């Protein structure tokens, strides 16, 4: 199995072929991120780049995922808490793996913590959430933009996995959730992703609400609200996200906040 500094390749060796579909997913070691990696790997002639915090300890679970004919998995270090990691990861993808274009970037990595009312919310916690949930999205876009530009015309997509708690219009529905730092920083990232849409006419850039998903993060949030678990299964969420990505167009999807289930638009 070929390996490089902070990266591992499994399956068909990428050769820079522009006809292959190349996906990049952050937060890929578990939950929605891992589910998306598995789904994309099941598609023939795909290169799937799974971004994780620690390649040595987190690549095994990903390397066991089945690959379709002609598809390959690249596991690369990208810790969203490290400001230089997005640029370093892209540099390594180009130099060590001959990645010449990316068709779809999914900014999925996120944290949710510092539970409690905003009256006692520590500023340090806000800063930590802002780095992971917002600043890293900007840095990821800046790092991957040149490779997105090399995708086939009308194919490049930058997708942010958002959260319904970030909507201002419908805040009353989620107001009792003690997730001020999470909601605030997801909201800030929404602005950036919509801004990418307006500033880059060649790019589809949009937010997908994945639902309240049965992941470690989702179930923790559910318990805070007195529920046993989140209502949306991981597979339901992943299937919906993939469908929204596949059907996306510049005219109908880009610059929007879309529900994973049916693509309906959510208010900002």
Curated annotation (Swiss-Prot):
Belongs to the short-chain dehydrogenases/reductases (SDR) family. It is an enzyme of class 1 (oxidoreductase). One of its GO terms (molecular function) is norsolorinic acid ketoreductase activity. Pathway: Mycotoxin biosynthesis. InterPro entries: Fungal_SecMetab_SDRs, NAD(P)-bd_dom_sf, SDR_fam. Gene3D superfamilies: NAD(P)-binding Rossmann-like Domain (3.40.50.720). The lineage of its organism: Eukaryota, Fungi, Dikarya, Ascomycota, Pezizomycotina. It comes from Dothistroma septosporum (strain NZE10 / CBS 128990) (Red band needle blight fungus). The active site is at 182 (proton donor), 186 (lowers pka of active site tyr). This is Norsolorinic acid ketoreductase nor1. Its EC number is 1.1.1.349.
């Amino acid at each position: 199995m070929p390996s490089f500094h902070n990266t591992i390749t499994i399956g068909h060796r990428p050769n820079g072929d522009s006809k292959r579909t190349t996906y990049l997913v952050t937060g890929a070691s578990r939950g929605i991120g891992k589910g998306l990696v598995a789904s994309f790997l099941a598609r023939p002639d795909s290169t799937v780049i799974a971004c994780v915090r620690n390649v040595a300890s987190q690549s095994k679970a990903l390397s066991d995922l089945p690959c379709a004919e002609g598809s390959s998995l690249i596991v690369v270090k990208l810790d969203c808490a490290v400001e230089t990691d997005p640029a370093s990861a892209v540099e390594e993808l180009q130099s060590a793996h001959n990645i010449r274009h990316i068709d779809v970037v999914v900014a999925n990595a996120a944290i949710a913590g510092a539970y409690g009312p905003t009256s006692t919310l520590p500023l340090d916690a806000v800063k930590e959430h802002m780095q992971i949930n917002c600043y890293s999205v900007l840095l990821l876009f800046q790092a991957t933009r040149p490779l997105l530009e090399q995708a086939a015309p009308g194919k490049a997509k930058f997708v942010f996995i958002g959260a319904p708690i970030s909507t201002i219009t419908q805040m009353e529905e989620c107001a009792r959730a003690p997730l001020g730092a999470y909601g605030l920083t997801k909201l800030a990232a929404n602005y950036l992703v919509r801004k990418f849409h307006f500033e880059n006419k060649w790019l589809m850039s949009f937010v997908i609400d994945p639902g309240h998903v049965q992941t470690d993060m989702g179930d923790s949030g559910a318990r805070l609200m007195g529920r046993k678990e989140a209502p949306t299964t991981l597979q339901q969420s992943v299937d919906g996200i993939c469908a929204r990505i596949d059907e996306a167009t510049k005219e109908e999807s880009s610059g929007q906040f879309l529900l994973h289930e049916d693509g309906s638009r959510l208010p900002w």
